[in-house]
Every structure is written in structure tokens, then in C-alpha cells.
């Protein structure tokens, strides 16, 4: 740090006397900065530096701005020497380029772990900050040394010793960590002394440290003892023993019994004291809120067993009542009053009320790519506003939902005056790019097709650090080729108005049934719907292959509000699409009316609108809260030009509740979440298409379907039967986050049903429809036995933006007559993690 400060001071002092001596003194003042360049780079990518300093391009040069840029250069800690220079970029000296000639610090050529035998080198490398290819930094090396030591202590190696050194070699620096592990220490026994009110077995359950057993490692952690002592104290304090304490923890180490491990016996000495009851609370000095309002925050009844934890929670809720309304500088003090004879504990709370606090500054630290305005616009608090705790919490939720940051640490500090506060946001950015490419199987089972296709997708959710989204998606295969482009501006004209555009080109080779000659609305050679529905597949000779070309352009917009109870979003968009099918019309006629009509260039336009209420804590991986959304889509905007006219409604609801959230370590909680979802979709046709379908001349495309992937997991083999006009879909998931924000183990129960509104019968059921009213009634009664397609099973759900996949095994079943009828085989399901917004 001393070297860094000295270098910065020297550069600042020389700026006016040497580095900036050009044609005229101070010619660069007030001139726009056209570029910032770095000379002397060897290992550091220029693009990385361009991203960091691009925000300064176009700004006018000032001495303060120059110092800010120079400070950021030194903060990178990439360079041992920095020489600044101002260079004109035009003969008239109207633009200035800041040129930094630098000498890079050496890069890390390699990292070695020496002496470790019990913990793999790969595990140790994952615990350190320095990586191969990074610029060497001695401070980071020392931090990594301490990180490794803490990791060993967490694994029970209490006597571990770690040293580090940097060896300069050709091409960089090799960092070496030398480790003396020692023997692992495990807890063989835990015992208590002095406990009378509670048994030893009860108190053991309070501790995070456990005895070594068959399914419990029992690793001894020195730093866990203080937390365990506090846990015992809290357990007693919740039950009226307000003076209870753990006087000490004796450790008896056995080094002889087990040659590979040290066995330790922990003995907790407890002083319990007397049990007290709650004697009530007196509040003085309050004027803004009534005494009754404040007393209601403490949910303890006079005469009940004293619960210190509940009282502290109530006292905090009382303080939050002021804090929520902007009174952050109030003084609150509580005094205990004991009646040792009656064994009661009462309190007196003194409130000194002051003026409301206002936000003076919002300070952002740690950003390199993201512009400050992208963060500030998500804040519901602005400089000059009355501070509100709920708005502050909701602002943090908005920032977390952006998924731009791997770490976000907020802080509220006093401002320049008593009634002013500064909000400080310490952030650490993460990658917002999503790049996917690979090979997928397509056309499997089709004669004469090449069963592979290539795909590539690039998506950037924080384009140029401005919070906008851009995406490119391309697919190349023998049966399908597509190109999709998308752009979304999340805050249009500085308001929470979203504006986006999409463009798509697609070519596909598809199959359709040939039209029959029976005039009964069935494909050749089938004579009844029962025969068609029960057929496992169609013979190759009865299928018509055709090519389909689509071109589409769409636009969408949305607006959102932030009331206290939820985030409200209203969205809408239009989609303009032209399609054309290619097939031999002289010798073949398709059974599908849509395919037949689209032999000529056909326009398909649609309009959609949606509204949602989002009360989830985090939109992308919720643990609590709820969501309610409604979307309506109108296909066919021009009555006489377009032939496809339909309306679709989608209603969705979600609910999440946390069942368990137990801190196992400083970085991981054992967490269980229960998630519920229900959805109803309805699609109806109107106009010409509705009348033509009623004549039995064909079938319509785009019906609702149980696809077996996103809807009705595991039912993909029956997708052609499971289509209709009404779709009901429900699921329940038990979620266990294995790595928070990355991957979760889920166990799901899924139920879905499609229904044909016109025929008044469920699709995919075993019963047949009948033309007579009595037969139809009987059919509907029989069909109702197997309406829902159900499934259950385990799976892994990835919540990373770069890897939004679900991997699951599903066992499908129905319930005819209320009796579950399961299948023996399990189906593997690969789907995407789709979050409703």
C-alpha cells in the first residue's frame, strides 16, 4: 500500500509540470476525452481495460476527472509503473487522448500445493483468490494463505501450519503453499456439568458441534465453540433463565487411541441461575407513536415465562417502527428492573425522538463494468428522500434480481449532519454473458436424415454495462435452420419502461398427415378417432413431408411499479410473421388446414398483453413469497387478410415457503423450500377458422399440449394425443439448495390435463367420443376417471444464468377410479429453468 500511495503521489505531482507539457500549457482542459490507451501491455487484455475505462470517453477533461481515472488505474494493482501523457488526436487540439505507458506486474505462472495429503489440491485451489494467469499480488497471496488455514481448521486440523512464497521464473511467478497438516481432531464425546433444568441430551441438540458417529463426521472446530456457548445461553434465556451462562469448555485430547486422529472430549460447565417471568414494559418519551402501538411490538404476556430472545425481537421491531418512517437518529435505551423476590423481570424503554433522516448520498463501490446509473435507477430511495427501511430492503431485492453481482454488501452510515445518512453499496460483479454451443440430436428415426444439428447462443444481460440485453441464437441442421436476434432496453428514456425488438428467420422440414377421402375429418387410412388415437405411430407411406419458411419481427414494451406489497409489471407486444409451406400440391393434400392454407405466403400477426404481481423474495430462485400473472394473446389482427384467428389466456400462480433455514457453516445453510404452482390456459378459435373446423374438413394447429418437458414431466411419448383447448397444470416441489444460487435438489409431483372444449372430453383418455348424446355423456363420465396425467420424481435444478437446465427422472401414472396406476419405467427429462416474470 505504501508503494501504491507513493507512486500515485508522484504521478499526481508531476501531472502539471511534465506529463502534460504539450503545444500550449493546459491545452487539454475542458477538451473531450476521445480515447484512453495503454502502452506496454503483455498479459492483460486491452479489451478488459477498455471495458473499465469506456465510461470516461466523451467526458470533458478536468483535473478532478483525471485524478479519478489515475486512481482507478492504480486500484487495479496491475502495474508496477505508470507514466501518463496527454496526446491530441486532431491538428486543432480539440480532442485529447489519455495515454498510459505501463509496466505490468508479473503474472502467476502456476500455483503449487506442497505437503497436503488429506485434502486434495483441487479443493485447496478452489479456496484461494489467485488463479493461474492473474497478475501477481503479494497481499492476495497472504490472504490466500489465511483462507487455506481457515479451511483446514474447519476440517478439524487444529495444528496445521501453512507458509507461502513466490518464486520468480521465466514467464512469470510460481506461488507455492507449503502445508504441514498434522492430525485431524474429532469430537468423541460431549458432556455437561451444572445442568439441572435440562438434560444433557437436550442441550447437545442445541450445539452445532456433534459427536463423531456413523453418519456424523464430528470434526472439531475451535471457532465453533463460541457460537455453541452462545447457543446454550440463548436456549436458557428463551426459557426464563436470564443469568444462565457457560463458564467454560474443557478440552481433553486423546492422541493415543487412534493413530490417525486426535479424539477430544468437550465438557461444558453451565451456571443456570433462577427462572424469571415477564413483568411488563414501560415506555417513556414517545410522541410520534402511542404507547399502545409500541407495546404491541413486544409479543410477551405479563406473567409468562421470560423469553429474552422474543423480547429482543420485539425491541428491534419497536426500533424498526421508527426506522421504517425515517427516524434513524432516534435514541432508544432499555433498562432492566428485577424483582428477586417475585422472580419477575420488567423493562423501561426511554425514547428520544429526533427529526426524520434524509438520504444525503448513495455511494457505489466495486463496479468495473456496470454504470452507476444502472444501479441507482433500481434504488427506490433517492438523495433527498426520507429514509425508509422497507424501500431500502426492496431496493436491495431489485439489485439482487438483476443478477449482475456475485456479492452485494449494503451499509448505512451517518452523513455530514445529524439527520442525514449515506447509503453505501459494496458490489462485486459477475459474468452476465451466457454463451452456449454444441451438438444436438435431431431427426432420429427419420429415413435419409442426418441426425445431428449444431447450435450456438450468445446472450449478454448487461450489454456495455448499461443494463440492456442482447442475444443471438443460431441453429444449423439437416431438418431445421434458424437465426434469432433480440435486443431489450430495460429503462427506456430513463423510466422503468422496457422496450425490445426481435427478429427471426426459420426453415424447417416437417411432416403432416395426408388428407383422407372419407370426409369424416380423419387422416387416411383411419376410419375412426379411436383408431387414430390408439395408433402407436403412422406408417411412413401415409405421411407428407413439407418445408416451412418463417420470417418474423416483433416489438414489446413494459412498465413496472414498486408498491410495498409486490412488484407490478404490465407488458405488451406485437409480432408480425410471414410463412410459406412448400410441398407437391398436385399429388398431395395435407390433413391440417393450416398447412394447406399456408402454401401461399401467409401473414400471421399477433398481439399480447400481460400483468403480474410479484411478491417473491428473489425472482430467479425464490425461498418465500408469491406470484400471480395473467397473459392474453390475440392471433390474427386483420379479419379478412389473415386466416388464423384465435385467443389464448394463460393464468399462473406461485407460492413459496421456507420450511427450514439452519446455518451449518459461515457460508452454507441447510435449507428446505416448498414450492406450489397452478396454471390454467384456454385457447379458442373464432371467425372463419372456427366455422371451417366445425365442418370436419381438417384439424387446426397450435393447440395446447402436454409436452412432457415443461408441462406434465415424463409424458412426452403421448404428446400427440395430449392436445386440446383447455390446459390445467399444477405442481408441488420440495427444494433443497445444494449450492445457493447455483444448483438445487428437487423432488416434484406434477399433474396436467388437456380438454377439448368443443367435444367436451379430455384428450389422451381411454374412452371414445360418440355422436349421440347418451354416448357422449357416458364417454365423459368414463373419461373423467383419467383426466390428469401425473408424474413424480427427483431432479437437479440449475439456477445459473449460464446454465438454466433441469435434469429429472419422472415416473408417470394416472388415477382411474381414484386408484393410482403407475408405470414401471422411469423417464429422463431434460428441460429449462423458466422463471415467470
From Swiss-Prot:
Q: Where is this region: Disordered?
A: 761-785
Q: Which domain of life is it from?
A: Bacteria
Give induction info: Transcribed at low levels, estimated to be present at about 100 molecules per cell (at protein level).
Q: What cellular component terms from Gene Ontology apply here?
A: cell outer membrane
Periplasmic side residue ranges read: 22-433, 462-468, 490-499, 544-554, 616-623, 659-667, 737-741, 800-802, 830-837
Used in biotech as follows: Recognized by sera from 42/43 syphilis patients, it shows promise as a diagnostic antigen. In further diagnostic tests for syphilis this protein exhibits a sensitivity of 86% and a specificity of 99%. A fusion with TP0453 (residues 32-287 of TP0453 fused N-terminally to residues 38-450 of TP0326) exhibits a sensitivity of 98% and a specificity of 99%, and exhibits superior accuracy in classifying analytical false-positive samples than a commericially available test, making it a better candiate for diagnosis.
Every copy of the POTRA domain together lies at 31-105, 106-182, 185-273, 276-354, 357-430
Which residues belong to the signal peptide in this entry? 1-21
**Record has Disulfide bond as a keyword:** no
Parts of the chain on the Extracellular side: 443-450, 477-478, 521-530, 569-601, 637-644, 683-724, 757-786, 815-824
Report the transmembrane regions from the record. 434-442, 451-461, 469-476, 479-489, 500-520, 531-543, 555-568, 602-615, 624-636, 645-658, 668-682, 725-736, 742-756, 787-799, 803-814, 825-829
Subcellular location(s) per record:
Cell outer membrane
Q: Name one GO biological process term.
A: membrane assembly
* Keyword Lipid metabolism set for record: no
Q: Which Pfam families would you find in this protein's record?
A: Omp85 (PF01103), POTRA (PF07244)
Positions with biased composition (Low complexity): 765-784
Query: What keywords is this UniProt entry annotated with?
Result: Cell outer membrane, Membrane, Repeat, Signal, Transmembrane, Transmembrane beta strand
Any idea what job this protein has?
Might be part of the outer membrane protein assembly complex, which is involved in assembly and insertion of beta-barrel proteins into the outer membrane.
Similarity section: Belongs to the BamA family.
Q: How does the record describe its quaternary structure?
A: Part of 2 complexes of about 239 and 164 kDa.
Relay the record's extra comment.
The outer membrane of T.pallidum has no lipopolysaccharides, few proteins and is a fluid and very fragile bilayer. Its lack of surface antigenicity is thought to contribute to the ability of the pathogen to evade the human immune system.
Q: What is known of its domains?
A: The N-terminus (residues 22-369) partitions into an aqueous phase and is predicted to be periplasmic, while the C-terminus (residues 426-837) partitions into Triton X-114 and has the hallmarks of a beta-stranded protein, suggesting it is membraneous.
Q: What protein name is recorded for this chain?
A: Putative outer membrane protein assembly factor TP_0326
Amino acid at each position: 500500500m505504501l508503494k501504491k500511495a507513493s507512486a500515485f503521489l508522484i504521478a499526481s505531482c508531476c501531472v502539471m509540470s511534465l506529463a502534460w507539457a504539450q503545444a500550449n500549457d493546459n491545452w487539454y482542459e475542458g477538451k473531450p476525452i476521445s480515447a484512453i490507451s495503454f502502452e506496454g501491455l503483455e498479459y492483460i487484455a486491452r479489451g478488459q481495460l477498455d471495458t473499465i475505462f469506456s465510461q470516461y470517453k466523451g467526458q470533458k477533461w478536468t483535473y478532478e476527472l483525471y485524478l479519478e481515472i489515475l486512481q482507478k488505474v492504480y486500484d487495479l494493482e496491475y502495474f508496477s509503473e505508470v507514466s501518463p501523457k496527454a496526446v491530441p488526436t486532431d491538428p486543432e487540439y480539440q480532442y485529447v487522448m489519455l495515454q498510459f505507458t505501463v509496466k505490468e506486474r508479473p503474472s502467476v505462472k502456476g500455483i503449487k500445493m506442497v505437503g497436503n495429503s488429506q485434502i486434495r489440491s483441487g479443493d485447496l485451489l478452489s479456496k484461494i483468490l489467485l488463479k493461474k494467469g492473474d497478475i501477481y499480488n503479494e497481499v492476495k497471496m497472504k490472504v490466500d494463505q489465511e483462507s487455506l488455514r481457515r479451511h483446514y481448521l474447519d476440517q478439524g486440523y487444529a495444528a496445521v501450519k501453512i507458509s507461502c512464497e513466490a518464486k520468480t521464473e521465466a514467464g512469470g511467478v510460481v506461488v507455492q503453499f507449503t502445508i504441514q497438516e498434522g492430525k485431524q481432531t474429532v469430537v468423541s464425546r460431549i458432556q455437561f456439568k451444572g445442568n439441572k433444568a435440562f438434560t444433557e441430551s437436550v442441550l447437545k441438540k442445541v450445539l452445532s458441534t456433534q459427536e463423531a458417529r456413523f453418519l456424523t463426521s464430528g470434526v472439531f472446530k475451535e471457532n465453533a465453540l463460541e457460537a455453541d456457548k452462545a447457543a446454550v445461553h440463548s436456549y436458557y434465556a428463551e426459557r426464563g433463565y436470564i443469568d444462565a451462562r457457560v463458564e467454560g469448555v474443557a478440552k481433553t485430547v486423546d492422541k493415543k487411541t487412534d493413530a490417525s486422529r486426535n479424539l477430544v472430549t468437550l465438557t461444558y460447565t453451565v451456571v443456570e441461575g433462577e427462572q424469571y417471568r415477564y413483568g411488563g414494559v414501560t415506555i417513556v418519551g414517545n410522541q410520534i407513536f402511542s404507547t399502545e402501538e409500541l407495546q404491541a411490538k413486544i409479543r410477551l404476556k405479563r406473567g409468562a415465562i421470560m423469553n429474552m430472545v422474543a423480547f429482543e425481537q420485539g425491541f428491534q421491531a419497536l426500533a424498526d417502527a421508527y426506522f421504517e418512517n425515517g427516524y434513524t437518529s432516534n435514541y432508544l435505551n432499555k433498562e432492566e428492573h428485577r424483582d428477586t423476590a417475585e422472580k419477575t423481570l420488567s423493562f423501561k424503554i426511554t425514547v428520544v425522538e429526533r427529526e426524520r433522516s434524509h438520504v444525503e448520498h448513495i455511494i457505489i463501490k466495486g463496479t468495473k463494468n456496470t454504470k452507476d446509473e444502472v444501479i441507482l435507477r433500481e434504488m427506490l430511495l433517492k438523495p433527498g428522500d426520507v429514509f425508509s427501511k422497507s424501500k431500502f430492503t426492496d431496493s436491495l431485492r431489485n439489485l439482487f434480481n438483476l443478477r449482475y453481482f456475485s456479492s452485494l454488501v449494503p451499509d448505512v452510515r451517518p452523513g455530514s449532519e445529524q439527520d442525514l445518512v449515506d447509503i453505501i453499496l459494496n458490489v462485486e460483479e459477475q459474468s452476465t454473458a451466457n454463451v452456449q454451443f454444441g451438438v444436438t440430436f435431431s431427426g432420429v428415426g427419420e429415413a435419409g436424415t442426418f441426425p445431428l444439428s449444431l447450435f450456438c447462443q450468445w446472450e449478454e444481460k448487461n450489454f456495455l454495462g448499461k443494463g440492456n440485453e442482447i442475444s443471438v441464437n443460431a441453429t444449423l441442421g439437416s431438418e431445421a435452420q434458424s437465426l434469432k436476434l433480440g435486443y431489450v432496453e430495460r429503462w427506456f428514456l430513463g423510466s422503468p419502461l422496457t422496450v425490445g425488438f426481435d427478429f427471426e428467420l426459420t426453415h424447417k422440414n416437417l411432416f403432416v398427415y395426408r388428407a383422407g377421402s372419407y370426409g369424416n375429418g380423419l387422416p387416411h387410412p383411419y376410419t375412426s378417432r379411436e383408431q387414430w388415437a390408439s395408433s402407436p405411430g403412422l406408417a411412413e407411406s401415409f405421411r407428407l413431408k413439407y418445408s416451412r419458411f418463417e420470417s418474423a419481427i416483433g416489438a414489446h414494451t413494459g412498465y413496472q411499479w414498486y408498491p410495498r406489497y409486490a412488484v407490478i409489471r404490465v407488458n405488451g407486444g406485437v409480432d408480425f410473421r410471414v410463412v410459406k409451406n412448400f410441398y407437391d400440391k398436385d399429388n398431395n393434400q395435407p390433413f391440417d388446414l393450416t398447412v394447406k392454407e399456408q402454401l401461399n405466403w401467409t401473414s400471421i400477426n399477433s398481439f399480447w398483453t400481460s400483468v403480474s404481481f410479484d411478491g417473491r423474495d428473489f425472482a430467479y430462485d425464490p425461498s418465500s413469497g408469491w406470484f400471480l400473472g395473467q397473459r392474453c394473446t390475440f392471433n390474427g389482427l386483420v379479419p379478412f387478410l389473415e386466416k388464423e384467428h384465435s385467443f389464448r389466456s394463460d393464468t399462473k400462480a406461485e407460492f413459496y415457503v421456507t420450511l427450514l433455514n439452519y446455518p451449518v457453516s459461515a457460508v452454507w445453510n441447510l435449507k428446505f423450500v416448498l414450492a406450489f404452482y397452478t396454471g390454467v390456459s384456454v385457447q379458442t378459435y373464432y371467425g372463419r377458422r372456427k366455422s371451417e373446423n366445425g365442418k370436419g374438413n381438417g384439424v387446426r394447429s397450435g393447440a395446447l399440449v402436454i409436452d412432457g418437458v415443461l408441462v406434465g414431466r415424463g409424458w412426452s411419448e403421448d404428446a400427440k394425443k395430449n392436445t386440446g383447448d383447455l390446459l390445467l397444470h399444477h405442481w408441488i416441489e420440495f427444494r433443497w439448495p445444494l449450492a445457493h444460487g447455483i444448483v438445487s435438489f428437487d423432488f416434484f409431483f406434477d399433474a396436467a390435463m388437456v380438454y377439448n372444449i368443443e367435444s367436451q372430453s379430455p384428450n389422451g383418455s381411454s374412452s371414445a367420443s360418440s355422436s349421440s348424446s347418451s354416448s357422449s355423456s357416458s364417454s365423459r363420465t368414463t373419461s373423467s376417471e383419467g383426466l390428469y396425467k401425473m408424474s413424480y420424481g427427483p431432479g437437479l435444478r440449475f439456477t445459473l444464468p449460464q446454465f438454466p437446465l433441469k435434469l429429472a427422472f419422472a415416473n408417470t401414472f394416472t388415477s382411474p377410479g381414484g386408484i393410482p396406476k403407475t408405470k414401471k419405467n422411469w423417464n429422463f427429462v431434460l428441460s429449462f429453468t423458466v422463471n415467470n416474470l
